[in-house]
Amino acid sequence: LEEGHRLVRCMEPSAAWGARWVSATSPMAKRYMEVATKKQSLVCLAADRNTMAGLFELMEAVGPHVAALKTHVDLVDDWSAEAWATFCEAAHKADLLIFEDRKFADIGKISRSQMAGIYDIRSWSDLVTAHLISGPDIVDGLQAGWDDVGRTGGVLLLAQMSSRGNLLHPDYTREVVEKGTAHDGVFGFIGNGSRPNELEALRTAVGDAKMIWTPGVNLAVGDGEMGQRYGDPTEAVLAGSDCIIVGSGIHKADDPGAAAAAYAAASWKGLLQRNG
């Protein structure tokens, strides 16, 4: 299969993902692995643009090289329901999962209502993030939100964070993993891509049935702005990450498309080495 100037060898998801493909319990996890295999990319772009034009421009540039877009719908200054619907339709046509990083934290009943509301997150998101601080009912509430509109989605629970001084301590992480791995509505967990040792421990605790997605990675390893730390993308995948979440490393690059392709190559290399 010829894609631009790059020769892409077709591979079945089962061959690329090994045990993760066999053990995955979430339909959305299978969908993600299919898209990632097709694009040979374990990259989710943190699409932190605050205008609709900026989001469309970014999606067009990086779409072939990323498997998902992480959005913050409430950051968009000129948001409208019509423009957002057009954006989401284009994203899905480009084989991009839409991951709304809402970080829900309330009780299940309220979270279900928040999936509706002015942004109607339930109608376009494939994945959302949540804290488990209010208990497992939050996952039931979020899944009920998707059920209300006849859609399927997955919840990513925050088990670790990559920012300095965060309060997600090991005991909390352990409880999140214990409760999350037992819940069918949980797609997976957010881990810390900047610390491979912590990520390896998280993968051991999680097992193969759930995804681990990780921010905190950059081809330029080190400290970033506002307390962020960065680890190497390939190392993160080798340590157990199933998707690297990349923001400024792509959208602030002179050529976002080329940057996305570089991250895709680094992530795919890690997956093949991990399962090789």
Give the positions of each predicted feature:
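Hydrophobic faces of well-ordered beta-strands that scaffold small-molecule active sites
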Residues: S41-A47, L69-T71, I98-R102, V128-A130, ...
